[in-house]
Design a protein with these regions (language model features):
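Short, surface-exposed beta-strand segments enriched in small/polar/acidic residues
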Residues: 27, 50-76, 99-103
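Periplasmic OmpA/Pal-like peptidoglycan-binding modules at the C-termini of bacterial envelope proteins
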Residues: 6-10, 90-123
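Generic structural motif
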Residues: 33, 66, 117-121
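Solvent-exposed, acidic/flexible segments
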Residues: 34-42, 70-81
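Short loop/turn segments at connectors of secondary-structure elements within structured domains
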Residues: 55-57, 82, 108
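Short, solvent-exposed beta-strand/turn patches at coil↔beta or beta↔helix junctions
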Residues: 5-48
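Cysteine-centered nucleophilic/redox motifs
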Residues: 45, 77-92
Length: 123
């Protein structure tokens, strides 16, 4: 890593994300330093969330620690997670979101995993 890249891990540089989903899970895989979402990506996230509005969401940010320091990997995970939460809150402002960040030396992909947690109805 050159000196000019230090501290610029999450600046959008024309790279993209991949979004895959199942009924219970949405996985956003980040390629490179991209931190923002295109309109098309936002539509994919919205489509997955449509029938989950009555659920709480859990976001797990997984950030590899191979090329950056532990503190930078945590910062990157929290920044991306907050940006993702802002996008979700624009669509569904009342949804409850919990987030965790895992910096894993063994992981090679930077990704966000969104799952649902059914709300408990108070008696």
């Amino acid at each position: 890593m050159s000196g000019k890249e230090v501290g610029v891990y999450d600046i959008a540089d024309g790279q993209k994300i991949d979004i895959t989903s199942t009924k219970n899970e949405l996985v956003i895989t980040y390629h490179g330093r991209l931190r923002s979402f295109s309109e098309e990506d936002t539509h994919k996230i919205k489509a997955w969330l449509e029938d989950k509005i009555n659920s709480n969401l859990l976001i797990e940010m997984v950030i590899p620690q191979a090329d950056i320091s532990f503190s930078d990997s945590l910062r990157l995970g929290y920044e991306r997670g907050i940006i993702l939460m802002k996008e979700i809150k624009k669509i569904y402002p009342d949804v409850v979101i919990d987030m965790s960040v895992n910096s894993a030396a063994s992981s090679t992909m930077s990704k966000a995993i969104i799952t649902t947690i059914n709300k408990k109805v108070s008696e």
